[in-house]
Amino acid sequence: MSELFEEVEVEAYVYPTEDIEKVKKAMLNLIPDLEFEAFDRGDYIILTAKTRSRKALSRLYELFRGQAILDTARSFLEEGYFGEEIIIKVNKQAAYAGVVNFNEESPLGPITIIIRTKDPQRLMKWLAPRTKDGVPIE
């Protein structure tokens, strides 16, 4: 069976009022095994991280089910699907608390997750299958 994805990249802006370690923790709460790079842009820092770990999406998989948000997650995955990339944006403060919230509207900006995959339909079916009455049907 081929891999579900090639790479996961995560990005967030870190503003002067924020603690970069807390932003890293927020990112790691969603995607484990990240390797970070920071780029200082003066007024803010761009924090990026990548992983090719097979476990990279395991936390999102668990959170989507634990929070009973498979249908919502599926719609955001489909909305962010472009060719061989799926891009979703989540609330940074919610991620710090270990929760997925797709309302990225925040003065601090979102965490952007980019999933690179050769088979986006298969990945979406695994990560956030369609449901009926809250039960996965695919």
UniProtKB/Swiss-Prot annotation:
Database matches in PANTHER family: UPF0201 PROTEIN TK1335
Organism: Thermococcus kodakarensis (strain ATCC BAA-918 / JCM 12380 / KOD1)
Protein name: UPF0201 protein TK1335
Recorded superkingdom: Archaea
Family recorded in the similarity comment: Belongs to the UPF0201 family.
